[in-house]
């Protein structure tokens, strides 16, 4: 499955070892499915995606929740959205063998700023062209996908201050998942108030982090 290179930062939006595989492991299995297991019978889930990028996490979330009686409010932070040519080049719906998701996926990418778009009857997406540091919203989020570029590329996104800001946006028992398991990141999350779970990572990554607000 495709990934995209950000030439300015010399970093890819997803693992070069398979974008779909990585996102399913880190964000779906360790995040979304864990939240649903913890909150059986919940009717609504507010998700914050820090680093919308290619939109893959949103697409996989739509795929995973469509058959369930769960209303998703999906807030996507992306200060540098992809251009139309890059979006057209993404092959995720074909790779998933889900051509029926192609139109909803396109709706996600062309959503108006700060206005919900009904991707499906149970999935509303909100686009926020701001940085995580400047993002302001009520305390409603049960799940955070932290998919920013790595600390070596954007160290300013992996600080105690940023994680404390996210902590304050989340509900009790909320979950934050990220592919990064560096010691500095674990310590910053702990200092922000989270309980840390180190769990097996996707291919070519030994560990990842699931952080819980208790």
Give residue ranges: language-model regions:
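Rossmann-like AdoMet
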Residues: 1-45, 62-96
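Conserved S-adenosyl-L-methionine
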Residues: 48-53, 78
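Glycine-rich SAM-binding Motif I of class I
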Residues: 55-59
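S-adenosyl-L-methionine
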Residues: 86-138
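A short SAM/SAH-binding and catalytic strip from SAM-dependent methyltransferases
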Residues: 141-156
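A short glycine-rich, Lys/Arg-flanked "PGG" loop and its adjoining helix->strand segment in the class I
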Residues: 156-173
């Amino acid at each position: 499955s495709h990934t995209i290179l950000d030439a300015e930062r010399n970093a890819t939006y997803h693992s070069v070892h398979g974008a779909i595989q990585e996102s399913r492991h880190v964000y779906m299995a360790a995040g979304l499915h864990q939240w649903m297991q913890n909150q059986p019978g919940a009717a609504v889930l507010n998700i914050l995606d820090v680093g919308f990028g290619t939109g893959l996490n949103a697409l996989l979330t739509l795929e995973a929740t469509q058959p369930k009686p769960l209303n998703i409010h999906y807030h996507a932070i992306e200060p540098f959205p992809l251009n139309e040519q890059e979006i057209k080049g993404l092959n995720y719906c074909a790779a998933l063998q889900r051509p029926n998701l192609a139109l909803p996926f396109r709706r996600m990418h062309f959503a108006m700023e700060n206005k919900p778009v009904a991707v499906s009857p149970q999935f509303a997406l909100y686009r926020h062209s701001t940085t995580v540091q400047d993002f302001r919203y009520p305390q409603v989020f049960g799940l955070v996908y932290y998919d920013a570029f790595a600390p070596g590329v954007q160290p300013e996104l992996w600080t105690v201050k940023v994680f404390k800001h996210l902590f304050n946006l989340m509900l009790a028992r909320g979950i934050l998942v990220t592919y990064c398991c560096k010691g500095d990141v674990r310590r910053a999350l702990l200092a922000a108030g989270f309980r840390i779970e180190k769990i097996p990572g996707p291919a070519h990554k030994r560990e990842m982090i699931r952080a819980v607000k208790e």
